[in-house]
Design a protein with these regions (language model features):
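Selected transmembrane alpha-helices and immediately adjacent juxtamembrane segments
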Residues: 1-11, 94-202, 272-302
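Hydrophobic transmembrane alpha-helices
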Residues: 2-11, 22-29, 39-46, 70-74, ...
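Hydrophobic alpha-helical transmembrane segments
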Residues: 9-12, 17, 37-55, 94, ...
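Juxtamembrane inter-helical linkers in multi-pass membrane proteins
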Residues: 16-46, 120-143, 187
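Extended, low-charge hydrophobic alpha-helical regions
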Residues: 29, 50-63, 164-279
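Alpha-helical transmembrane segments and their helix-entry boundary regions
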Residues: 34-38, 64-65, 92-96, 203, ...
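Membrane-embedded alpha-helical segments of transport systems
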Residues: 43-49, 66-81, 98-107, 211-217, ...
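Transmembrane helix-loop junctions at the membrane interface of multipass transporters and ion channels
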Residues: 74-97, 257-266, 290-299
Length: 302
């Protein structure tokens, strides 16, 4: 559906006009305005969003790939809804929308930072505006089908191997009836202590989230027992640490399908740079969010 939507925008003449409208923002971060469509697709799924960067010049596409995952994909919504339902029940509707807005703000801030560090000037590109037209259903389906098949062909093998590795980590016990996933999460959990969620279960859920963002809730539900996910969230997080966790979750590297797609489009070296940058951005942002909330002791977060 995402590929069909992208094809419709391109063939109808709407896409170039959307690019023109977004040019003040994209040029500010040193990226071609043609990257506006991939950014919008990022709210649906990061994989086709990365694929659509082919329409952007190589330099802008690489720079856009650093901040593209900051546009929150739909797979993250269940996690946001679960946390908001537990810690911000009365302010539920006022919490979800700012999360998505903050993702866009983080993308602009870190995009501007990348432009300044790279000493890149603002981009003023020219976009041709074709006439509006209604594309035929068959052409949309044919083009989107070709794009979908190409994506599956490129990432299927790697994704299958990584999924198998995730299964092994979850179900193979190492010692004391602990799975390999639990052992790994126990090793890395101290890293997240300054962020307010330095426990094994939170770390395990973040590892699961790398394989699929919905895996965060799945991982938590496995160990929730009869109490359910809500009980586990209340036990693991305070309001401040919950906001810190969501900040990290919103900014840390996307799922393996997206990472694999990034590798196929830009190469292994660039993919590693993107993952390291996104992890660093998530860690630093989450650290400051947690420390500031604790320092200010806002009544809402006590």
């Amino acid at each position: 559906l995402v590929y069909a939507y992208l094809t419709f925008l391109e063939e109808s003449g709407i896409a170039p006009r959307l690019c023109v409208c977004s040019s003040p923002f994209t040029s500010a971060v040193g990226i071609s305005s043609r990257a506006a469509i991939p950014f919008m697709l990022g709210f649906g799924c990061t994989v086709p969003a990365i694929d659509s960067l082919r329409a952007v010049d190589e330099e802008s596409a690489k720079r856009a790939s650093y901040i593209l995952p900051f546009f929150q994909c739909s797979a993250k919504f269940p996690v946001y809804a679960a946390f908001a339902g537990v810690f911000f029940r009365r302010e539920f509707s006022l919490v979800i929308l700012p999360i998505y807005a903050c993702g866009v703000c983080f993308a602009l801030v870190f995009g501007l930072l990348l432009r300044l560090l790279g000493r890149q000037n603002r981009i003023c590109d020219i976009v041709e505006l074709p006439r509006y037209r209604m594309p035929s259903f068959s052409s949309v389906m044919r083009s989107s089908g070709e794009k979908c098949a190409d994506t599956v062909k490129k990432i299927a093998t790697v994704l299958l191997l990584i999924s198998a590795a995730a299964w092994v980590m979850n179900y193979v016990t190492v010692s004391d009836s602990k799975s390999l996933m639990q052992c790994v999460s126990g090793i890395i959990s101290p890293i997240f202590a300054p962020l307010g969620f330095g426990n094994d279960l939170s770390s395990a859920s973040l590892i699961a989230g790398v394989f699929a963002k919905e895996g965060v809730l799945t991982s938590l539900s496995v160990f929730s027992g009869e109490g359910g996910v809500k009980y586990v969230l209340r036990e693991l997080f305070s309001r401040a640490s919950a906001v810190s966790f969501l900040t990290f979750f919103a900014l840390y590297p996307p799922c393996v399908a997206s990472i694999t797609k990034m590798r196929s489009e830009f190469g292994t070296v660039h993919m590693i740079k993107c993952v390291m940058f996104q992890f660093a951005a998530a860690y630093v942002s989450s650290y400051f969010v947690y420390q500031i909330l604790n320092y200010l002791a806002i009544s809402l977060l006590r």
